[in-house]
């Protein structure tokens, strides 16, 4: 049975709620036990971007398990996401489970696509600009679609039409 939950908040109440939640989430105590900690370990934009994408890819399930598995995954990348990706270190990854249904084969596939993006654009931010993600009414979905298209192009004819 599905119920629709409707909450009527004034603009002021909504602002208060969002400010309260932002303060809670942006605290060191919350960050220490949340996957958001992983991109914060890095200072270079590409390392932050790759760590954020990888952490978000496996961020489903128990937070403690997600953090443990993300820590292991970044260790597999020698804690140098961009260098590891550009150097194709992922080709030597042993077949193993990364997190739940995400395996080394999935990670290799993902990093191959990210390598393609970083070689062509230098950063995910520049890729997003080139793809005009900012014009989308749903930028997160548009970015995911653009990344998936890049992954698809690794294995199909050079026609982007095949990867729409």
Specify the residue positions occupied by each region the protein language model found:
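Charge-rich, intrinsically disordered N-terminal extensions
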Residues: 2-58, 64-67, 71-74, 78
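Non-catalytic, well-ordered alpha-helical scaffold segments
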Residues: 48-52, 67, 105-112, 141, ...
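Long, acidic, intrinsically disordered low-complexity segments
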Residues: 2-15, 119-134
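Structural motif
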Residues: 40-49, 100-106, 138
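Hydrophobic/aromatic-rich structural module bridging two neighboring secondary-structure elements via a short loop
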Residues: 79-119
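Single conserved hydrophobic/aromatic residue that forms the stacking wall/gate
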Residues: 155-164
């Amino acid at each position: 049975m599905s119920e629709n939950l409707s909450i009527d908040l004034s603009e002021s109440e909504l602002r208060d709620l969002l400010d309260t939640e932002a303060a809670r989430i942006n605290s060191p105590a919350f960050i220490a036990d949340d996957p958001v900690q992983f991109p914060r370990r890095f200072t270079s934009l590409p390392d932050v971007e790759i760590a954020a994408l990888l952490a978000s890819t496996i961020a489903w399930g128990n937070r403690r398990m997600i953090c443990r598995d993300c820590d292991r995954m970044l260790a597999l990348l020698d804690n140098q996401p961009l260098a590891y990706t550009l150097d194709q270190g992922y080709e030597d990854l042993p077949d193993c489970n990364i997190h739940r249904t995400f395996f080394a084969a999935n990670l290799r596939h993902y990093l191959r696509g990210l390598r393609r993006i970083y070689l062509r654009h230098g950063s995910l931010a520049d890729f997003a600009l080139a793809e005009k993600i900012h014009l989308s009414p749903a930028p997160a979905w548009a970015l995911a679609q653009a990344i998936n298209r890049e992954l698809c192009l690794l294995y199909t004819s050079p026609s982007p039409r095949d990867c729409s």
